[in-house]
């Protein structure tokens, strides 16, 4: 199997210069040494020339850089993305805890061990696989989680509120997907998603009543969360598509794209909406807005549209955002 040969720092600088990137050499040396050529290549790929005959669905860029590309701007894009990941991860953490709490409240309303009962969940939910994954997390947590160890020694079983503390967002999202549709709608409404089903066509209504759209959005946010947790590139990431038909009937979410959303703007808008319900007065939307203004808009060769942002993005992200109290 052939692989690309490794290159020295001097060779990397020469490659970038020959392909048309303007170099601040001391800065470039520092970044290539600290961050690596390969990691940065994911950011300067967006600065490579896109041929006129490129496939719009799977465009392949040329090696040559767009005129005006500088290492300084690529480093600025990297820094913006790093700050964006930090902010997004913070927001998703709050959403994860809130979703876990609401799902847990529904599950334990009659029995603390109801999560073990497959009849509680919708047809098609792989309860056995989900429960096996949860038990695996419990076993791994015994050595470090005092509550898990206590319940293992004293009772031999675990109420959901104890189990919940070892679940990650993907576990909770999958569990939410497994709930009956009426439970999903109830939890979704708790987050402020008051869908006007009367504005949906018959096919869209059926889809909405079969499964709440928040399920797919949580799936998308799980992907976003994992991107952030693994320090991967976020700003122009294509995500698991989430339907927008039902949520676009909510005035504060009307700027979502038609049909479905697979770019970052939709995820950020839904996050801002949920966080205003979870933490009234949250400054998260304004922090996001400020970051875009201070760090992204100074990048002369990048466009906010790459992340799926519409013209009215600022008003939409900050809708009903009155308080500046930090939380």
Report the location of each language-model feature.
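Long, contiguous internal "core" modules enriched in hydrophobic/ aromatic residues
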Residues: 1-327
